[in-house]
Amino acid sequence: MLDVQWNQWPETLIVFLKWRLTCSKGEHLPETAGDKCMDKTPTLLQKGLAEMFGTGVLVLIGPGSIPAALLLINGGNGKAVFTMADLGFIGLAFAVAIAAMVYTIGHISGCHINPAVTLAFAVTKRIAWNEAAVYIIAQFIGGILGALGIALIFGASAASTIGFGPTNFSEAVTSYPQAIAIEALGTFLLLMVIMGTAVDGRAPAGWAGLIIGLIVAGEVIVMGPITGPSLNPARTFGPAILQVLFGGSYNLTHLIVYFVGPIIGGILGVVFYDFLTRARAATASKAAQNLQEASA
């Protein structure tokens, strides 16, 4: 704290108030006070570690809720049929994990915790490609670490019984193109919501984590019986790989669906949102120009 002498308290109070004001604005005073603000710009390493942590928590809680549900339904004796209530609670687990991470690491890395989000932002030049590469590597590592957490909780033997929660689909019911289209649609909707609540500066402050979590929960309920859904390559990759490594079974060719679909859908979602916002800006500009010409 500041070294206050009673005969200097007015000046000290002014310095302290300026320090608090600059901290709240994310600015810095000179070394005497500004170095006390905990808002320094994160390094790329810090951002990568935040993405790894966030993705790990997402996988631990989201996919981790699936073996938890199976354990309660049938005592861990294999597959079971989920009810809408089961899907609802699994969706809620994803929503809680996403909201918690948005509010925890959003100010550090932006809380992508999803390679499809990072790639979409890189393609639309919202993040540099070298930074995107670090994010994506960190996200996949985080997905693996999250799956290791699931193995720690339920035991390695769970890989061959209740599994580690990777997304999957039945080829007898759903073709690869249909599964890719479903994943693309789901990720398209997710990115539209992310853009509208977290990226667009006109969005109400403080709601992004909750709303993004809720759209994922809704998609889990609707698309869960068909493809999972994944909406996130790292979310599926970690549990799938660890499930196989620990003696369980998983058709790794299904990863094609959970990579291609989210990447396509994510890019389309950002591009479409940009189109919508540019269209509004162009319309407003044209209206202002017409008004100016009419008043001339």
Over which residues does each language-model region extend?
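Compositionally biased, low-complexity intrinsically disordered regions
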Residues: 9-10, 33
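Membrane-interface helix-loop junctions and terminal tails of multi-pass membrane proteins
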Residues: 16-19, 23-296
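Tryptophan (W) side chains
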Residues: 6-9, 19
